[in-house]
A protein has these predicted regions:
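Conserved mid-domain beta->alpha element of the FAD-binding
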Residues: 1-78, 82
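C-terminal lid/capping helical subdomain adjacent to the catalytic/cofactor pocket in oxidative enzymes
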Residues: 22-28, 42-54, 62-67, 84-138
């Protein structure tokens, strides 16, 4: 049985499916729980509008989102972008004055970029993905 922070093997069956925290419960890191629920809702609406039947739309929604969200659940288990706090505590247990004395800008940028990539928030990926607009029947 999956624990509260373990990725779920599936989000639904037939005409019943989960989204948001119900589908991908995770530690509250990265400040994106609400964002992920909105993205899920938008993707679900898009897939349902494109599908010939609701069951196919629900399956397409899960197929489109589950792998990325499972990676994000696992990333958040490791602290997500807040892993910076763990590293700083390890490197400077007695405190510090400037973050640059503890971590390089490259390290900070790398952690942030990796999380954006895992979450699907990289600017290039967002700017090149197809529109979620569904053509209305004439």
């Amino acid at each position: 049985m999956a624990g509260p922070e373990d990725p779920l093997p599936n989000w639904g069956t037939g005409r019943v499916n989960l989204l948001g925290d119900a589908a991908h419960p995770m530690y509250p890191f990265g400040s994106n729980g609400g964002t992920q629920a909105i993205i899920d809702g938008r993707m679900l609406a898009w897939e349902l509008a494109r599908a010939d039947d609701p069951v196919a739309g629900l399956a397409a929604y899960e197929d489109a989102c589950r792998e990325r969200m499972n990676a994000l659940v696992l990333s958040n288990r490791q602290g997500g972008p807040e892993q910076v706090l763990q590293l700083v505590e390890q490197r400077a247990p007695n405190g510090f004055t400037r973050i640059e004395d503890v971590m390089t800008n490259d390290e900070l940028d790398s952690i942030a970029m990796q999380y954006r990539k895992t979450a699907g928030f990289e600017a290039e990926a967002l700017n090149t993905q197809p529109s979620w607009e569904v053509a209305k029947p004439a």
